[in-house]
């Protein structure tokens, strides 16, 4: 009996040790992605190339052309559901966004009580997409890569530009085109195709809506698909050094049932850095 108990204890300790090592390696990988974003070029001064509606939005946010910044970062409190019709789960995240080249890192955690049960990393670094989820930060449960994922992450980078106004003025990879009195399209070329997002501005010149067609996604059965994508921004206020929309929501337009959000949240603790 004592021998069996000792074997059980040793096995448990070994499992805990393996999980600790795996979690440490995952954390190191996340920090490595953040370091690669820090090595991207600083933002440039491109105000003269932009539609006035876009340039005015960035300047009103507090962006200073030629400031030489590389990164924006912020914390996020939100709700996320992982499948169509699923329940929302509280999610906290830390996000870093490159300003002079397309790139971001989203490091999110979902918890059950005091225990973190899922850690999700969603990123676009070096023109490649990364999507990985781990139970307890150590046990892999999902991992994706490839050209479709990279294109989908490029869509996300564009859609979240209202939270990175310095990139609007300073990223030369972005191409802008006015498509209506209150609408502007922004494009980003990738190896898997061109990501296109259209922003809708209100009468005050703030971005309040986002829409895109053909974003790579998974359908309700988990199969590869392309879907229309929608988002909203609201509650503009000063957050750190920038005037930004505190609230954001995004979801897919599902055939037959229409729009369904899968993420909604608020940002805080906003910073920019060279």
Question: What do these predicted ranges mean?
Answer:
Residues 185-274:
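Gly/Pro-enriched, hydrophobic low-complexity segments
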Residues 80-90, 106-116, 158-171, 186-192, ...:
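Short, solvent-exposed secondary-structure boundary motifs
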Residues 1-40:
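N-terminal membrane-anchoring alpha-helices
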Residues 56-139:
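N-terminal mature ectodomain segment of secretory-pathway/periplasmic proteins
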Residues 132-190, 221:
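Flexible, processing/modification-adjacent segments and terminal tails
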Residues 26-73:
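N-terminal leader/targeting segments and the immediate start of mature chains
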Residues 92-95, 123-126, 132, 166-171, ...:
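Buried hydrophobic residues that stabilize the cores of well-folded domains
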Residues 94-106, 119-131, 179-182, 200-208, ...:
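Short, solvent-exposed coil/turn segments at beta-strand boundaries
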């Amino acid at each position: 009996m004592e021998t069996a108990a000792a074997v059980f204890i040793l096995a448990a300790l070994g499992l805990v040790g393996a999980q600790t090592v795996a979690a440490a390696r995952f954390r190191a990988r996340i920090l490595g992605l953040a370091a690669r974003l820090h090595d991207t070029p600083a933002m440039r001064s491109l105000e003269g190339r932009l539609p006035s509606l876009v340039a005015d939005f960035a300047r009103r946010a507090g962006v200073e052309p030629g400031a030489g910044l590389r990164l924006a970062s912020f914390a996020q409190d939100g709700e996320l559901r992982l499948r169509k019709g699923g329940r929302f789960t509280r999610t906290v995240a830390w996000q870093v966004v490159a300003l002079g080249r397309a790139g971001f890192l989203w490091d999110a955690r979902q918890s059950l009580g005091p225990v973190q049960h899922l850690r999700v990393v969603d990123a676009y670094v070096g023109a490649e997409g990364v999507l990985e989820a781990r139970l307890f930060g150590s046990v892999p449960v999902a991992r994706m890569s490839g050209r479709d994922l990279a294109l989908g992450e490029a869509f996300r980078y564009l859609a979240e530009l209202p939270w990175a106004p310095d990139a609007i003025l300073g990223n030369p990879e972005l191409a802008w085109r006015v498509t209506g009195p209150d609408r502007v399209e922004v494009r980003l070329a990738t190896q898997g195709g061109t990501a296109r997002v259209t922003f809708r501005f209100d009468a005050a010149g703030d971005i309040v809506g986002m829409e895109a067609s053909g974003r790579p996604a998974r359908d309700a059965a988990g199969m590869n698909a392309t879907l229309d994508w929608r988002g909203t921004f609201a509650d503009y206020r000063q957050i750190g050094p920038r005037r930004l929309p505190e609230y954001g929501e995004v979801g897919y337009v599902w055939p037959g049932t229409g729009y369904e959000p899968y993420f909604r949240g608020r940002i805080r603790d906003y910073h920019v850095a060279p």
